[in-house]
Amino acid sequence: MKELSVNNLLGIKYINENDINLVFETADHFKEVINRPIKKVPSLRDITIANIFFENSTRTKLSFELAQKRLSADVINFAASSSSVTKGETLVDTVNNILSMKVDMVVMRHASPGAAVFLSKNVKASIVNAGDGAHEHPTQALLDAYTIREKLGDVAGKKIVIVGDILHSRVALSNIYSLQKLGAEVRVCGPKTLIPKYIEALGVKVEPNLRKALEWCDVANMLRVQNERLDISYFPSTREYAMQYGLDKNLLDSLNKEIVIMHPGPINRGVEITSDVADSRQSVILNQVENGVAVRMAVIYLLASKIK
């Protein structure tokens, strides 16, 4: 059996193209499984997984839990807001206490960039990063690339533009890493204040004009503005942002070609994307959500096989 080159999924930065393709091949199998009348397999009956979320989540948390249960793993969910973390307990102490209950794998979301890497060096368990601050969100990048592969046949040679708040987005960085490793060309588009200074060092060009970006690309991944991470004003108003960087049906229909529309969610309808675009036939937003379960099943299964 093929194996991942890593024991944890800490970020796309730490895995290679073969790892990504192995996840995709495994996800293909699980996608077939979850479309059966009985959507469950007994693969991980002897594995216990803890979902530890220090930040709010809807899609990612539900997707991971569903993936784990469809693999027949035992699952425990930990909410930091109602735990001893509020009493001053450290991250390592919290996780080690959970691991002492014979937990094999930890899926963690944390507000601090690098939290998953730090944890992997200080506890004995397989760690899956479900998002660490504005750093990485590896499973989102994997499911995004998987969806592009499903829609367009391959990722290599495709042109993808990521539009919006690149500076505060963990999705953007993980997508850049994964798409480049798979042979795609990536550009970003957004207000200058929301483009990180290091972006061109990653081999990514900046296109400040949304129309030009859309005319260039095969796929547009629309990101919301991360208002919860904004400590100052990065643009004059939400209305002006929507006028400059929001994708509406008029703009989409005026292009001389058909492009694929993506969004990692949650959507701020009427800001970065209008409802008639988000719900159009060119949109694969719900496909991304569906594929997230199969991709996360693949990641968990492949990491668990290394524990065994």
From Swiss-Prot:
InterPro entries documented for this protein: Asp/Orn_carbamoyltranf_P-bd (IPR006132), Asp/Orn_carbamoylTrfase (IPR006130), Asp/Orn_carbamoylTrfase_sf (IPR036901), Asp_carbamoyltransf (IPR002082), Asp_carbamoyltransf_Asp/Orn-bd (IPR006131)
Positions annotated to bind L-aspartate: 87, 170, 224
Protein's pathway: Pyrimidine metabolism; UMP biosynthesis via de novo pathway; (S)-dihydroorotate from bicarbonate: step 2/3
PROSITE patterns to which the protein is assigned, alphabetical: CARBAMOYLTRANSFERASE
EC number(s) from the headed UniProt entry: 2.1.3.2
Record keywords, A-Z: Pyrimidine biosynthesis, Transferase
Family membership: Belongs to the aspartate/ornithine carbamoyltransferase superfamily. ATCase family.
Subunit structure: Heterododecamer (2C3:3R2) of six catalytic PyrB chains organized as two trimers (C3), and six regulatory PyrI chains organized as three dimers (R2).
Role, per record: Catalyzes the condensation of carbamoyl phosphate and aspartate to form carbamoyl aspartate and inorganic phosphate, the committed step in the de novo pyrimidine nucleotide biosynthesis pathway.
Protein name (record): Aspartate carbamoyltransferase catalytic subunit
Species of the source: Flavobacterium psychrophilum (strain ATCC 49511 / DSM 21280 / CIP 103535 / JIP02/86)
Lineage of source species: Bacteria, Pseudomonadati, Bacteroidota, Flavobacteriia, Flavobacteriales
